[in-house]
Regions:
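Short loop/edge segments at beta-strand edges and connector loops
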Residues: 10, 99-101
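N-terminal lobe of the biotin/lipoate ligase/transferase fold
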Residues: 1-92, 158
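Long, positively charged amphipathic alpha-helical accessory segments at protein N-termini or as interdomain linkers
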Residues: 5, 67-72, 76-97, 107-228
Length: 228
């Protein structure tokens, strides 16, 4: 990746949507990040809402175009992004921090970060990607979200959100240089996988007994279900 341009806004419905709008109007170029103090329509995987207090957390989206990226290697983007966010969070806390498949980050068994990746595909190639990331930095109260946490909640230390952003950009640069190295990215991802070899986990909202074996090259997770 080349130098990343940072655009800061006070508030927006969604940093992903804001980026997409700017891309369509041709007002931004490759390797641009939008960072917001607040977003009032943020969402995560499966259209779940992402709630964040004003100015307390890192809310950002990266626009990137990877030349000649085949659709068959699409999961490499998720691997690289998940590892980038994981490494960023681990920079600031000592608690156990892992990737919950497909791309949530958990610290001390609670969600500290969420990722939403939107890819445009043309002629079996990834035309561009918008990578939305939320990292809970200084927020202490999470109404109706008992399984959420933040860096400050775990360390009792206030952080400048921009410092977290710059660390994330540094890690994006590191892992996107390895974007075509599926073996490296997948090994790193599996080494940091939450619930690996675990005997109980949630599957489609139900607690089942089984064992998470690993994540595969296509991004799917291999699970061994124990018979009753």
């Amino acid at each position: 990746m080349s130098t990343i341009k940072i655009i800061k806004v006070n508030a927006t419905k969604s940093t992903n949507s804001k980026l997409r709008m700017l891309i369509k109007s041709k007002k931004i170029h490759n390797n641009t990040i939008i960072s917001a103090n607040y977003q009032y329509g943020g969402r995560g995987q499966s259209d779940k809402r992402w709630f964040s207090s004003y100015g307390k957390n890192l809310i950002c989206s990266l626009y990137i175009n990877i030349p000649d990226m085949r659709q068959s290697c699409l999961q490499n983007i998720n691997f690289a992004v998940s590892l980038s966010v994981l490494k960023t969070v681990k920079k600031f806390i000592n608690n156990s921090t892992l990737i919950k498949w497909p791309n949530d980050i958990l610290s001390a068994n609670k969600k500290i970060s969420g990722i939403l990746i939107e890819n445009s595909i043309k002629s079996n190639k990834v035309y561009d990607s918008i990578i939305g990331t939320g990292i809970n930095v200084n927020q202490l109260v999470f109404k109706s979200l008992p399984k959420a946490t933040s860096i400050k909640k775990l360390t009792n230390k206030e952080l400048n959100v921009d410092i977290v952003l710059y660390e994330l950009i540094k890690n994006y640069n590191f892992y996107f240089l390895k974007i075509r190295n599926t073996k490296y990215l997948l090994n790193q991802y599996n080494e940091n996988l939450y619930g690996l070899n675990k005997c109980k986990f949630l599957l489609e909202g139900e607690i089942v007994k089984g064992k998470i074996i690993r994540v595969l090259e296509n991004g799917k997770i291999r699970v061994e279900i124990f018979s009753h």
